[in-house]
Amino acid sequence: MDLRRRALLGVDGLRVLLMLFHTVTRIMAEQEVENLSGLSTNPEKDIFVVRENGTTCLMAEFAAKFIVPYDVWASNYVDLITEQADISLTRGAEVKGHCGHDESELQVFWVDRAYALKMLFLKESHNTPKGPEATWKLSKVQFVYDSSEKTHFKDAVSAGKHTANSHHLSALVTPAGKSYECQAQQTISLASSDPQKTVTMILSAVHIQPFDIISDFVFSEEHKCPVDEREQLEETLPLILGLILGLVIVVTLVIYHIHHKMTANQVQIPRDRSQYKHMG
């Protein structure tokens, strides 16, 4: 019995060690993150990199702002009125994250963890007439804020921490193996734990890739958002039309010049019949 008990204890101890090793390995992997926002020429844009096993597995560049409604007492101290806090993601934020085969996560904390942003990315496969195609998307956003923080909130009623979550989110949909790029502003609505409050998240200057990064610190081919493609078309269309119009004018002038030259070389028939006798 003693030998059997020792064997069982040995197996249990090995399991515990393996679990501890797995936990420590995961924690170390999550800590391989870098905030490279100082490299950005845009002071409002942040750059975050998650690295596992010595290579980049998630890269994210974006500017983020949160519009947060909150209640304050009116001047009569009886009624409540709603104010608005504009909270921007600042440089020097703390960042965490991890990468998986079909699920990756980015977490950002700033202002002494008064604010926290969590972004969850999923990769999934779909059957299409052309065969199976894989895409990735932003599937969940969570924003935690503390309305007792005095920089952005002034005399908030029932001040404290609140959590705002997205619901049924499917944003930034991108073909697998590509990065998502969008300069235009995009808004995501988040339902807050503060009753009847909706937080608006505004993203801009976005460039993200949470899966299948081939080169270290280098984005793969860009998949541009429809808004950027439309704006690019609107910018290039006048140029194309101008070139076509210029070409039409040049062709018209050339044809006119050739026609004028040909008619100038023809014999001119006098209109005065009395001049016919001088011809020949």
UniProtKB/Swiss-Prot annotation:
Q: Which family does it belong to?
A: Belongs to the LAMP family.
Alphabetical UniProt keywords: Cell membrane, Cell projection, Cytoplasmic vesicle, Endosome, Glycoprotein, Membrane, Signal, Synapse, Transmembrane, Transmembrane helix
Q: Which gene encodes it?
A: LAMP5
Look up the signal peptide feature and give its range: 1-29
Q: Does the keyword Signal apply?
A: yes
Q: Name the Gene Ontology biological process terms.
A: establishment of protein localization to organelle; presynaptic modulation of chemical synaptic transmission
Taxonomy, superkingdom = Eukaryota
InterPro entries membership = Lamp2-like_luminal, Lysosome-assoc_membr_glycop
Give start-end ranges for the coiled-coil region(s). Answer: none
Its record classes its membrane topology as: Single-pass type I membrane protein
Q: Which residue ranges are assigned to the Cytoplasmic compartment in the record's topology?
A: 257-280
Which Pfam family is an annotated match for this chain, by its short name? Lamp2-like_luminal
Q: Where in the cell is it found?
A: Cytoplasmic vesicle membrane; Cell membrane; Cell projection, Dendrite; Cytoplasmic vesicle, Secretory vesicle, Synaptic vesicle membrane
Glycosylation sites (chain numbering): 35, 53
- This chain belongs to the protein called Lysosome-associated membrane glycoprotein 5
Q: What does the PTM comment state?
A: Glycosylated.
Q: What is its main location?
A: membrane
Q: Which residues lie on this side of the membrane: Extracellular?
A: 30-235
What does UniProt give as GO cellular component? Answer: cytoplasmic vesicle membrane; dendrite membrane; early endosome membrane; endoplasmic reticulum-Golgi intermediate compartment membrane; endosome membrane; GABA-ergic synapse; growth cone membrane; late endosome membrane
Residue stretches spanning the membrane? 236-256
Residue pairs linked by disulfide bridges in the UniProt entry: none
* Biological role: Plays a role in short-term synaptic plasticity in a subset of GABAergic neurons in the brain.
